[in-house]
Amino acid sequence: MAEKRDYYDVLGVGRDASDDEIKKAYRKLSKKYHPDINKAPDAEAKFKEVTEAYEALSDPQKRAAYDQYGHAGMNGGFGGGAGAGQGFGGFGGGAEGFGGFDDIFSSFFGGGARQQPNGPRQGSDLQYRMDLKFEEAVFGKETKISYSREAECHTCHGSGAKPGTSAETCHKCHGAGQIQVERQTPLGRMMSRETCDVCGGTGKEIKSKCDTCHGTGREEERHTVKVKVPAGVEDGQQMRLQGQGEAGSNGGPYGDLFIVFRVAPSDEFERDGAQIFVEVPISFVQAALGDEIEVNTVHGPVKLKIPAGTQTNTVFRLRGKGAPKLHGTGNGDQNVTVNVVTPKTLNSKQRDALKAFAVASGDSVNPQDSNLFDKILNKKYKK
């Protein structure tokens, strides 16, 4: 298995890169390697690598963990980036995934803060990747998703015991969930505390196990949930659905489901938050004399007035024609960049007209000069 590359190297940014620099790098690379656009054999693998790096560095807590511990810091809390490679995966249990210092010291010395291993525990969180079209991310949508999860057993209702029976206090740990173990070490005899090997730390012993779940109290199910994707979501953002994760243990609540959005790029538009960007070609004549053109927006076509003497790369703003603001009201703007296109071929009438224009402008024109239009544009229309 190939060694993972440094996340900063993957995105091509320095370790002191700002959030905005990381975001811009991700946008550029995700569009470059998106499987819908790039058909190279390794495009999908590179897209996943870029996505995994962005997920780590765009989150302040994950980035801090990565800066301190490297890839090991990612494995402790988030199960190796399951969302980048499959539909859903476990997030892990937050700090529990790393283990606490209390656990480390207490396992050797039998002291420290005692946990309650047989108490209620919340179920694991799950992650689901939802692919969205560009327009779906802009305007939102309602849909249903299905995924597999560990749910409470419908037969024993999570107890793990056969109906009509109940779990008993563990005969070995007496309900504590842990046992004291004495070991001989180079420092002498030492006592340590370990999870009970009979009850698995629950403090309860099931002698008549449920036939459905075989004593686990849980069973796998295909779960369906309705999701309302808010208008204005962006690639890489996530939404939390409380209680839609996996079943807890010992009466604990269900975990949560985190939906991570993957937005396909548009062939026509670029987007940064609520701002939409598009480039539109116009002719030399339209730029010189002015015109009214039709421009596509995410809301439909609109009219845009081009003033006489417009220069190439001029940006016009269409207010309120951008994407809805995710955390606010109203829409952003659409920014239209016009590019003046120089014709590559001319008929005789067009050449004569431009020669006359050059004479009227005081230009000395060599008819064989292939840079005729560059001369005119540079002299008459350059800022």
UniProtKB/Swiss-Prot annotation:
Per UniProt, subcellular location reads as: Cytoplasm
Residues annotated as binding Zn(2+) 2 are C170, C173, C196, C199
* GO CC term, one of those recorded: cytoplasm
Does the record carry Cell inner membrane as a key word?
Answer: no
Q: Which Pfam families match?
A: DnaJ, DnaJ_C, DnaJ_CXXCXGXG
CR-type ZnF: 140-222
Please list the residue ranges annotated as the J domain. 6-70
Relay the domain remarks.
The J domain is necessary and sufficient to stimulate DnaK ATPase activity. Zinc center 1 plays an important role in the autonomous, DnaK-independent chaperone activity of DnaJ. Zinc center 2 is essential for interaction with DnaK and for DnaJ activity.
> What is the recorded function of this protein according to its Swiss-Prot or TrEMBL entry?
Participates actively in the response to hyperosmotic and heat shock by preventing the aggregation of stress-denatured proteins and by disaggregating proteins, also in an autonomous, DnaK-independent fashion. Unfolded proteins bind initially to DnaJ; upon interaction with the DnaJ-bound protein, DnaK hydrolyzes its bound ATP, resulting in the formation of a stable complex. GrpE releases ADP from DnaK; ATP binding to DnaK triggers the release of the substrate protein, thus completing the reaction cycle.
What protein is this chain from?
Chaperone protein DnaJ
